[in-house]
Amino acid sequence: MDKAKFIDVLSDSTGETAEKAVRAALLQYPDAGVQIRLHTRVRTPEVARPVLERAAQEGALVVFTVVSPELREFVHASTAELNIEAIDLIGSLIVRLGTFLDREPINLPSAMLPLSEEYFRRIEAVEFAVKSDDGKEPRNFKRADIVLVGVSRTSKTPLSTLLAQRGLKVANLPLVLGVPPPLELMEAPQDRVVGLTIGIDQLCEIRQARLRQLGMPSETNYAMREHVRQELDFANRLFAAHPEWPVVDVTKRAIEETAVIILEHLKERDERAKVVRSSLV
């Protein structure tokens, strides 16, 4: 049996940046079975040392984001002393930026920095996404930066949450077979509506898994292939009737990749709008 492998993520703040970077890199090693241990608000050598000693004992990889030069140097020295494989995710970047900008860094962990306008914008966007999930507030479609439209289990909610974390106000609407979308969708700016589609095989699998999770029988219309096909056909007819809506196929795509595609559509939309405005001047 293979020995368990650990990655200790050490941060003087929330550790979110480092953890996301590690998880993104681990996607290239599926089924690696690596366990990530997150150590947050590590701001003194006294707190860091036990983490590093345990990592040395267990042969763990240490990934760290530390802005304090003194603590960063301590971690570098300790990992060398203890013969630990370590990756400094942010230290060299801070130093190189200082050289490029000809300025000294303030050396404060992100959690200790003043709350910015962008922070409050993200909070507002997340609250908007929660209130506008699953078509709950159709009146919000007009206010949304993006309105995601698709049949059940096309990643509308996780996409809304992910995009909201970037400060975008996102609403989403589930398409139900035979039920026309609410008038509010047609009254919203049509270049903000994005259709989501998915392959029938994957959608059936996802829905069957969902039914098993809920302890429900799989022989229901929700997961039956013919019914699923009818739902997808219904959605595709709606998308075809609105060619101004970009349609994104989420089949076998991570939500992060789908989000990037949607953001690219937004960028193209904004660039077209700029061209139109400049032609009117």
Curated annotation (Swiss-Prot):
ADP binds at G150, V151, S152, R153, T154, S155, K156, T157. It catalyses: N(tele)-phospho-L-histidyl/L-threonyl-[pyruvate, phosphate dikinase] + ADP = N(tele)-phospho-L-histidyl/O-phospho-L-threonyl-[pyruvate, phosphate dikinase] + AMP + H(+); N(tele)-phospho-L-histidyl/O-phospho-L-threonyl-[pyruvate, phosphate dikinase] + phosphate + H(+) = N(tele)-phospho-L-histidyl/L-threonyl-[pyruvate, phosphate dikinase] + diphosphate. Its EC number is 2.7.11.32, 2.7.4.27. Keywords: Kinase, Nucleotide-binding, Serine/threonine-protein kinase, Transferase. HAMAP family: PDRP. Pfam families: Kinase-PPPase (PF03618). InterPro entries: Kinase-pyrophosphorylase, PPDK_reg. The lineage of its organism: Bacteria, Pseudomonadati, Myxococcota, Polyangia, Polyangiales. This is Putative pyruvate, phosphate dikinase regulatory protein. Bifunctional serine/threonine kinase and phosphorylase involved in the regulation of the pyruvate, phosphate dikinase (PPDK) by catalyzing its phosphorylation/dephosphorylation.
